Structures are given as structure tokens and as C-alpha cells.
Amino acid sequence: VLIRVLANLLLLQLSYAQESSELVIGGDECDINEHPFLVALHTARSKRFHCAGTLLNKEWVLTAARCDRKNIRIKFGVHNKNVQNEDEEMRVPKEKHFCVSSKTYTRWDKDIMLIRLKRPVNDGTHIAPLSLPSNPPSVGSVCRIMGWGSITTTKVTYPDVPHCANIKLFDYSVCRDAYKGLPEKSRTLCAGILEGGIDSCKVDNGGPLICNGQFQGIGSWEGHPCAQPLKPALYTNVFEYTDWIEGIIARNTTVTCPP
């Protein structure tokens, strides 16, 4: 398992070395072996993916609070939505954990949901966890985004396979300048391409932002239409919530979410 995780991190590093002129909008199809930690969320009624998430270990998934629905189904090991991988699995939540409640998030705060699975997933060729970050992210980092979100801006077009792209991590002030109403301080990250053309978009919410090989962000909110110049997207800052996440996983009943 360790060898496979290291190999996946190497794939991510090689992906960062590519030019960022790719079109999730603006991206290319992800390599099938690049995203074993990427999960897809849908409801029992609908097979259409409405969000993504990240597998932390065999029993826990991290995604955005805005992705909460009744009767969520979580798919693991998915690449092509129309072609089932031999190790593909589906699970349902046993527990959902939020900061206060599922309705208290905003586009700049507490958009995070930690899900405990009713039954652990099995390790597989296309199923492997991604660790929480050991260090905070650095402004200027090249970051990887991925998901089954729309790959066009004006007319929604959902791909069969997840798309990946490289974007840049900016100072939070860049997003404050781009969007009215954001507070002076926030536990969110600001990332994108200032020239436009590359961005996370519809259904990419909840998916990972991976900077220099570390899981640093959760897709939270982007401008509409997506991928516009000078309009980076907002991502929940995972590092700010690591104590809360680790406390819940350790069954620490006194742990609290950052204020």
C-alpha cells in the first residue's frame, strides 16, 4: 500500500511539471492512476454526480458541507462513469460531521464535511487514501484540481472521466478584490489562473486542491460563469481544520471546530 501511495504522489508531481495551459474547465482527462483518493458523490435517486470528495483512510471521506444531501451514495475507484473498474466500490455514510451544522457554512467559512463510512472500503489499484497536510500551503504554489465538473463555461458539459488541471495559489486578498462581501480574514484559499480559462466548475465542489503533493484545499465556491479572468475560486483551507478532523477520527468528543 505504501509503495502505491508513493507512486501516486510521484504521478502528481509529474503532473505539476506539465504546462498549465490545459483546459476541469481548461483541463485534460486525468490519468486513470492519478486519482485513487478521488471519490464521487450522488444520491440514491440520481446517478448523476453532484460533488467530489477525498478518501482520508478506509473509513473516512472529506468533502464540502455544501455537498450534503439525503441518501448520499459515495463511489470509490471511479474513472469513466460508464465503465466500471474491477475494484470500484460504493458506500453510504454512517456519520456526518460539520462545524456546528450542515447549514452554517458560507463561501468563506466552515464549508467542510467529514463523513464516516458505514463500512470501510478495500484497498485497490484505483482506491488509496490521501493524507492530511503536514504543513500550511505557500502562496505561489502550483496546485492540481480534478473532478467530473463541467468542462465548458456557458453551456454545462459534464465529462465521462474526471479532468485535471494546474492552477496557482494566490494570496487571499486577490479573491477579496475579485468578490464583494468577503471578510478581511478567512479560512479559505484563493486559487486559479488570473488570465482565466482554467478553473474548477459545477460538480467539482468537494474535490481536492493538491499543492506540491499535499492535500491543501476542498473545492468550495467559484465565480459564475466559471474560469473568468481575475476571478479565482475559493477552497476550504484543510490545514486550518486538521486538529478538528484528526480529533473526530480519533473519537475525541471534546474537539471543536475552529471559531
UniProtKB/Swiss-Prot annotation:
PROSITE patterns: TRYPSIN_DOM. Gene3D superfamilies: Trypsin-like serine proteases. Residues 1-17 form the signal peptide. It is found in: Secreted. Residues 18-23 form a propeptide. GO terms for cellular component: extracellular region; secretory granule. One of its GO terms (biological process) is proteolysis. Its main location: secreted. The keyword Glycoprotein applies. PANTHER family: KALLIKREIN-1 (PTHR24271:SF47), KALLIKREIN-RELATED (PTHR24271). Snake venom serine protease homolog that may act in the hemostasis system of the prey. Belongs to the peptidase S1 family. Snake venom subfamily. This is Snake venom serine protease homolog rhinocerase 2.
